């Protein structure tokens, strides 16, 4: 029995299977297995997935940082050298300052030449520098992710990524703006998922996106000073669209024939907000909203409500929309919401993120807001088809006394005027007074719909970790610890690795 208990079962597994198992942990941790026995000496280096992250090494005192950087670079060089020309599935590299730039570019070129299919680059090793051109010329890449902590320049010469399906770029500066973007998209002939966040543009005023294969598009721009002159989207097979940017002067081409879900965070510039007036469009974004009017799921962020008010006329009809989420803000009015809700004839679920809004002259108009009017019942509410109304962050105080009472008044008004409501769910993460709860209980019999139920949910209720079915009330998660390259154990790994592979 003792012999069976002590038997090393894992070491008897096929070497290819062991390498596969080692690919599920960071390469630095997998390297520790080289100390187990002669058989394990090089196995970690032949894992099809390599994950190098210098942040888990930086536990040493600052005085030793140069030595740590040197050992990290030596470690990566040794692992890649041991692998030779073997096939690599995924290569992840996350580096900070102190790692030689030429070494990094050499590693990237090495894995691309070996046919890596998934490349993930992060950190600030290319800050204010151009990404090596070899990244954008690969016959094997299927997924490419570049996320840097500071701005990385994309200055493209050639783009040839015939198999790339997923492209994720963050903190990117497009040099030669529109030309660079067009070259990037046209060089990815089967691209399906494109994410571009924290974007900057060099001398760039007009933007154009055209792709017949794209299914998901996420765009977050960071240029707060310049509005684009013209934007076009020709993406007929797009299913998901997430768009945060300054509103453009015009949207010439908008082709979203297959769109199902959209999340819009458009905003006006400060001077546009200051000079906006009812009846005069600041810029014309109507074509964009017409283009997304066939969606089934729509999320509008607070600034987008202002864009609807001052940059869109008329608000289009959203015939297929069944789920609408609206983020609110104390500095943004609700002038556009009545017309929007009237133009959603099949809306089933309405979600408010907060119940904040700025009082405007339109609040007293018949259909100028959603707050309770002293004149008439809001027709956008009395004719609403909505069955489920969710209010997130209910009771959250924005900045003034009495905000909780105003929110309660709105809730009462919704319940009293929306005839098709079947469920109202109020989510709160602050303390709700007993007075509010009792008023809601009192209101339930007075709701417009006899089918409606009201549910109050606390989002910050305490949760406990489970260990073998036992609830641990006082459990404190220990901080994770990582061995750094000053550890004796890792000091043994590099010299023990040697230069010759165990197998090829």
From Swiss-Prot:
Protein name as it appears in the record: Putative F-box/FBD/LRR-repeat protein At3g59240
Alphabetized InterPro entries for the sequence: F-box-like_dom_sf, F-box_AtFBL13-like, F-box_dom, FBD, FBL60-like, LRR_dom_sf, LRR_FXL15/At3g58940/PEG3-like
Record keyword Cytoplasm present: no
Renumbered ranges of LRR repeats: 69-95, 145-171, 173-198, 286-312, 329-354, 369-396, 403-428
Keywords: Leucine-rich repeat, Repeat
Domain of life: Eukaryota
Residues spanning the membrane: none
The keyword Methyltransferase is annotated on this UniProt entry: no
Stretches assigned to the F-box domain: 7-60
Residue ranges occupied by any FBD domain in the UniProt entry: 382-427
